[in-house]
């Protein structure tokens, strides 16, 4: 049995700090074999840079997934080209920098496939079909390992749920990112795929999805353009732990994780 820790969108320095504080102890105390972190907001709230990625890897990440905001920092273009552990959604054009899949070998010697796709409903830019892309990439990954974890970076709950059912029995786990709000629907689907619509965010607790709450409230009240700033203060780490049978690739358990911390 292997255990994978899946961490929702890391938001800026508060998110990175709480990852650094708790992920090493979680790995040790719970016997975590693999850590997957969505990094698309990890650099000052938007995008990722080489130094930020390195910080997350040193804190215990094995692979970094992303989404539509991964392109916000120009440094990410070279990072995606050079580091196969940093993923962009696989359903971007083939000549976009980087890759949407990776195969990670755990310390215990098991290989796990990671796939990152982006939804199309209410999302920009428009990408290729995540369903067809996922089916194609999974067929290729299964030639190496039956254990596959999919990060679906999408806005619409319905699209993520539909992808979960579409991939049931084909992958070990489908988990959602992007909305920064965790859902309470973790379950194992009938054919053995663990599913969670959204893992939430890892970032400032007293915020509106990572942004200073006063700015967002003012925006709603005045309906005028605002340049948002990332919040600070206490932070929360949100995600899930999934257990997978290495021989079959089927999930045997999934549970949500939420840890609060302060002093960041």
Annotated model-derived regions:
Residues 1-264:
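Acidic, metal/ion-coordinating pockets
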């Amino acid at each position: 049995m292997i255990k994978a820790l899946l961490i929702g969108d890391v938001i800026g320095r508060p998110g990175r700090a709480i990852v650094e504080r708790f992920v090493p102890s979680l790995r040790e105390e719970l016997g975590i074999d693999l850590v997957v972190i969505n990094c698309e907001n990890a650099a000052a709230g938007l995008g990722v840079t080489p130094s930020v990625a390195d910080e997350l890897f040193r804190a215990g990440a094995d692979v970094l997934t992303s989404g539509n905001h991964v392109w916000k920092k120009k440094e990410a273009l070279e990072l995606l080209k050079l580091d196969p552990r940093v993923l962009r959604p696989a359903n971007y054009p083939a000549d976009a920098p980087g890759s949407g899949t990776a195969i990670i070998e755990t310390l215990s010697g098991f290989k796990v496939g990671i796939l990152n796709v982006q939804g199309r409903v209410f999302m920009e830019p428009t990408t290729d079909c995540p369903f067809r892309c996922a089916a194609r990439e999974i067929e290729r990954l299964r030639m190496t390992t039956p254990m596959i974890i999919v990060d679906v970076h999408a806005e619409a709950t319905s699209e993520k749920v539909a992808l979960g059912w579409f991939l049931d029995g084909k992958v070990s786990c489908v988990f959602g990112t992007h909305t920064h709000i965790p859902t309470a629907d973790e379950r194992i689907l009938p054919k053995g795929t663990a599913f969670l619509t959204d893992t939430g965010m890892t970032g400032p607790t007293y915020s509106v999805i990572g942004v200073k709450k006063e700015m967002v409230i003012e925006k709603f009240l005045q309906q005028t353009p605002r340049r948002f700033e990332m919040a600070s203060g206490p932070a929360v780490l949100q995600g899930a732990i999934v257990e997978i049978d290495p021989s079959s690739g089927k999930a045997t358990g999934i549970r949500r994780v939420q840890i609060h911390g302060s002093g960041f």
